[in-house]
Amino acid sequence: MSTMLWVVVAAVLLFVLPVVRVPMLDLTRRNIIRWQRGGIQKYTTRYYGFFHPYCNAGGGGEKVLWKAVQETLLYDPNCSIVIYTGDVDSSPKEIIANVIKRFDYEMDFNRVQFVFLKYRKWVDGSTWKHLTLVGQAMGSMLLTIEALLRFVPDIWLDTMGYPFGYPVVRWLAGLPVMTYTHYPVISSDMIHKIEIENQKQPSKKGTLKLIYWKLFMKWYQYVGKFVDVAITNSTWTGNHIRSIWKRVKIKVMYPPCSTEKLVKNSSPTAYETRQNQAVLIAQFRPEKRHKLVIQAYSDFISRTASKDHFKLVLIGSTRSEEDRAYVETLKSWAFDTLKIPKESLTFKTDCSYDDIKKFLAESTFGINAMWNEHFGIAVVEYAAAGLISLVHASAGPLLDIIVPWDSAKKQQLPYSDSTKDTRTGLFFKDKSDPDYKPTDAQFNNYGSLADIFEEANSLSIAERKQISERAKECASNKFSDNTFNHAWDHALDELEHKTSRLGSN
């Protein structure tokens, strides 16, 4: 079936579903055949359905998913979990093995079942060559319908960010909806940027694009009406979602970052034994800006040719052949084009969590170069493990993680009190940033990535230890798994209240 036909089908469903209820699904919910490659086993009458089409990706979003699953199983000892995933090329055993390997999470996996979705391509941007935002939104509606036709849970939890399916969940199955949003699908900043571009260079294409995005924003605002409990992962995301879903109470719940384990493995007395080495832990995807890091590292090496410079290790998971090809492209560019010595730069793909902890324990610096990283679990891991974070001055790393810290009072300070004695890392800006303005004062307050590489490399051992200890204290106070567990339990309490209200209607 062609892409356009699917769009037409989804459009029809969008307008028909609110008017024509489908009683078959309510009946199916009571008498559904519990299945999953051999049959979903019936443990209780309460099923929590986690909609996460890429549950095997191994990134920060998946860490949130699996910690939420673990805590939900503890919260309700009689419940079962259903994971809706499009990872049809992996078996349940393989997915579970990856959870243990990547995140070191153990739970009662006998109560975790998988519903495999055949049409995940509908939410893949590459499927929609034109009108990508609308295509993916329509696709998420269709994928939600597929999920509900295969299995109807008692509660719908979206931990990946497909909000356009929420009306479908309510209309078809009457379920309460809880969402954990990592980033907005579209934001007022994005629209404002197009408005400015259109003012500078007016065109019919620009005008149509602006209308298209504003209409899409209206749709995004509308689907928020179907959310019962809304959670965001950071201050930056929370501020944007509040401006979009104005009638919804938004909670900020920092992702689980396992800071307890990392702080425990980091000994202040062993700091001098750390290698002069920087790590970048991020999925191998272009938006993580590996090319910027490699270029900055090349520039940094050229500046410090006669000095000792830290080594760089790029660590990340690969989800597909496209990701693996991207890694090979980076290697060729770094070693063949930029002539970076192979002994200075190392690539590590699909490492186990134990391997990652080893790199964190022996390294001195941690890098995150993504622009507007909505949160940045890897940055928290750097801080908790005692690394000095070298990060982009935006969103989560700037607003939530690498913040001024008072060690005496063990509390975060306002940015106005930021000094060398309270800093927990170093920040940079780059001319390639989408919001770069040469006249903007904030860009003049930060050096380039190569600049902070040089600054970090020249820090004394005493300075490194002080920054490291402040960062560890901050991370362990704000981002522990235990903190997430308590917050998740409170959210489930609220959801219980919503469930009771919906059930009485």
Swiss-Prot record:
CC annotations in GO: endoplasmic reticulum membrane
Lumenal side: 1-4
Enzyme nomenclature, EC number: 2.4.1.131
Compartment annotation: Endoplasmic reticulum membrane
Predominant location: endoplasmic reticulum
Gene3D superfamilies: Glycogen Phosphorylase B (3.40.50.2000)
Catalysed transformations (reactions): an alpha-D-Man-(1->3)-[alpha-D-Man-(1->6)]-beta-D-Man-(1->4)-beta-D-GlcNAc-(1->4)-alpha-D-GlcNAc-diphospho-di-trans,poly-cis-dolichol + 2 GDP-alpha-D-mannose = an alpha-D-Man-(1->2)-alpha-D-Man-(1->2)-alpha-D-Man-(1->3)-[alpha-D-Man-(1->6)]-beta-D-Man-(1->4)-beta-D-GlcNAc-(1->4)-alpha-D-GlcNAc-diphospho-di-trans,poly-cis-dolichol + 2 GDP + 2 H(+)
Organism domain of life: Eukaryota
Signal peptide positions on this chain: none
GO annotation, biological process: dolichol-linked oligosaccharide biosynthetic process
Intramembrane stretches (start-end): 131-151, 375-395
Identification of the protein by name: GDP-Man:Man(3)GlcNAc(2)-PP-Dol alpha-1,2-mannosyltransferase
